Structure formats: C-alpha cells, structure tokens
Amino acid sequence: MNKEVLSLLNEQIWLENTASFFYLKLSKLFSENNYFGISNFFLEQSNEEREHMLKIFSYVLEQEGEPIVPNYNFLEDEEYDFNITVLFECSLENERKVTNSINKIVSKCKEVGDYTTENFLQWFVVEQREEENKFKEILDNLKIIGNNSVGLYELNKTLNPPTTSEE
C-alpha cells in the first residue's frame, strides 16, 4: 500500500472515531435535555461513524497496512451549549470535514494509481453525500420550526422512528 494513501486512511480512521464520539456526546446532551428521539438519532449516527472507522481499519489490515488505533480522550473537556440548531450546524460541519477527507484520499489514490483503494472508497463517497443531505434537511426543518415547541416535539419524534421487535 502506498505510504501516502496509508497515512490518509489512518487520518480517516481518526476522523471517523472523532465523529463517533462527537455524536455520542451529542446523544448524551440531548438526553439530558429530554429530547430522547434526537438523542437516539445521534446514538445511531455515532454507531454509523464507528462502523465506518472499522470498515477502513479492516481494509487497511487486509491490504497488509498498519492501521492506527485511535484514542478517545480528546472530547472529554469540550462543553457544548444546548442550542439545537447550532448543534446540528456543528454536525453538518463535522460531516463536511469527513467528506473533504474522503475526497482527499480518493484524489491521492488516483494520483498514485491505487485503484483498489479508490474503488473501496466509492461507498464512502456516496455515504457522505447522503449524510450531508440528511443534516441539511434537518437544518432546513429547524429554520421552519424555529423555537416552536410543537415543531421541536415533532422533529424529536421523527428522528426516533419506532422500532419493530422481532420475536
């Protein structure tokens, strides 16, 4: 595996890990403010980011590269004021950072002729477009809702669809 591509993939592992813990922290914050639906939404986002990290981690191992094992202490001291719109704006910005990082890796893969990794990353390119669009749509809804408690209640409910239990 090309050393520059490996370095970029390791940066991506770290970024996906950071995103996972960021969303986990937001899940806790929304739960503490009794927005349990939005809390569950961010818990799912955290799980998705962790899955992305593991997918890249496994790929690096399969390619006989050496993936990093990220730490998790980096968000401990960060505090966030509870403003729903601002928190979703931060989330969209987080997704944009991930998208830019993926695009940077794809560009490097093209430059060095690493078509296997470029092909592997196409799933992430599509996934990031979907993630950014999801957060843009939520922010558009928040602009319409404003501070309307009924609208916030509905958003909270919408972001926490009922689960079906299989017995």
Model-inferred region functions:
Residues M1-E167:
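Iron-associated oxidoreductase/ferritin-like identity signal
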